[in-house]
Amino acid sequence: MVQGGLDAAIAAVTESGQPYATETRTIDGVDFVVFSNAPDNLRELYRQGLQHADRVFFVYQDERFTYQEAWEEAARVGNQLKHAGIKSGDRVGIALRNYPEWIFAFMGITSIGAVAVAMNAWWSGEEMVYGIEDSGLKLLFADEERIEGLRPYDDKLNIQTIAVRCQPEGYIPWDQFVENGSRLMPADPVPTDTNATILYTSGSTAHPKGVLSSHRAILNALMCWECGGAIGAYMFPQAAAAPTPLYLPATILTVPLFHVTGLVVQFLQSFKPGRKLVAMYKWDADEALGIIERERITSFNGVPTMAWELVQSSAFEKYDLSGLRSAGGGGAAMAPEHARQIDNKLGKGSAGTGWGMTETQGLATGIGGEAFLQRPRSCGRAVPPLVKVKVIDKEGRDLPADETGELCIWGVMNFREYWNQPEATRSTLVDGWVHTGDIGHMDQEGYVFITDREKDMVIRGGENIGCQEVEAVLYDHPAVVEVAVFGVPDERLGETLATVICVNPDEPVSEDELKAFALDRLAKFKVPDHFWIRTDRLPKIASEKIFKRGLRDEAIELLARTT
C-alpha cells in the first residue's frame, strides 16, 4: 500500500464525527493532535470495563476477578484513601509484586485524582527510600518483601504503609484498610490534564528519574493503538472481515506493573476490549506456555527475548497454542533469525515489535506481519495519527532519510516533566519533542532503525563503534541466545570492545569460532577484544533489558585481576 493510501485512511478514520476524530489542542504551551472522544480520565476508562462486567479481568494463580469485582475493589480503595486524607495531586506509592492488589490500588488512586507512584519492586531498601523521599509520598502500599527492605529506615520515613498479603506488627493490613470502604466509585472531578502517574526510569543509572504523566497523555496513547487497528481495517477490509476469533481476548502480564509495558500496554489496554490479563509470579517460558494453553491466550507482548524463549522451549510442541494470534514485544531490537522462527512457529504474520519509552507511555513506533519479516531490524513507523518521529544532528537540525542522528518523538502522549528535575526536563522535552538519546535513522518509507544509544557508543582509538551493530551480528550465530557488548578501559586505545555471550548449552561454541564469525561480517576494529561465554542467562534490569552496566563492572574487575 502506497503512502497515499495510508494518508487517505488516516484522514477518513480521524475526520470529524468519527469515533477516532482528532483535533488540535494547546497543552502546556504546545499545539498537539488529540482524540476528540478520548475519556476524560482513567476512571472513565475503568468504567468502560463494566461493559464486560461479568467477564474475567485479572487472574493470579488460583484467584480470578471480574471487571465488576475490580471496579468495586478500586472504589473501596479510593474511598478509604479519601478517608485517610489523600487529595487530588497527592502521591501514593505502590511497591508490590504483580498481585491483584497492585491493580486495585492503582485504579483507586487514580480514580480520585491522586498520583500513583509505581515503585520499582526490585529496588534495594536504600533505593526505595530515595523514591519515597523524591516523590513525597503520603501513603504507601507494600508487600512483605518491600516492608522488610524498608525496616531499617522506619524511623527516618514515618510514612503510613498498608501491608499487602502480610500482617507485620505496626502496619495496617490491606483487608483492614479497605474493610469499611464503599463499593460505590467516588465521583470527584478529575480533569484530563490532572497528573496521573510517576514511573521511575529503569534504574540502570545511580539516581533514576521520576517520569510524571497526565491522564490525557495515557488515554490518548491507548486510543492511538486502537486507532491504528481502525486504520488497518480501513485499508484492508478483507482482513478486517475475517471470521470471529475462537476465544475472547486474553494476554499474559509478562513484565512488572511498575514498568510502562506492564502498566500501559498490558494492563490499561485491557479495559476497552474486555481483555483477560493473566499474571505470573515471575517470568518462566515453560510456565507461560502452560498459561497460553490453559487460559486461551490470544496475544503475547513482552521484550523480544521472551517470545524467542517460548519458541525455543523444549516443551513448545506439547501445548495447544492455536488461540495465539500475535506475539512480539519492544524495548530491544529483535534478531532477524529470532523474528523468522517466531513467525514460523506461532503462525504467519504473528510476529511484531515496537519502540517507545516510559516518557511516551510506551508509544512511538510499531511494525508487524510481512513488513516486520522484511525489516526485522526495524522497530517500525510512527504510530498514526498522534505520533511523529524525526532524526536530528548534534546541533538540533533535522536530518533527511537514511542519515544517522538522535531520534526524537513528538505527541500528546509525552510525559509532562521529570519530577524534581527541571534541568533534565528542559534538556529532554523541547517544544513537545522527547529527545530520546537513541541513535538511529529512518529510511525513505519512514521505518525507524535504532542503531545505538548515545551512552552506548564505544570509541576505540578514535573509531566510533555502535554496540547494537556488533550485537546484531553475534545474534545471527545459531548458538547465541543473548549478547551484551560494551566498552572497557584500555591504556593504549582509550577503550576496547568486550562482550558477554549466553549460548545454547546444546550447541557448544568457542571464542575463536565466534571471533571468526564476527570477523566475516564486521570490520576488524569492531570485533570484540574480550569474550566471556556462558550458558547462564544475562542479568536484567526491571524493564527486562540486559544489565550492561553490571556486566561491564564485572568485566573491568576481571581484567584488572589478569593484568
What are the functions of these language-model segments?
Residues V34-A38, D54-Y99, I103-M107, S124-V129:
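Conserved AMP-binding/adenylate-forming core of the ANL superfamily
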Residues W123, V129, L140, F300, ...:
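AMP-binding/adenylate-forming catalytic core of the ANL superfamily
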Residues L219-L253, F258-T298, S313:
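Conserved AMP-binding/adenylation subdomain of ANL enzymes
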Residues R381-L386, R397-T428, E463-I465:
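Conserved ATP/PPi-binding loop(s) of AMP-dependent carboxylate-activating enzymes
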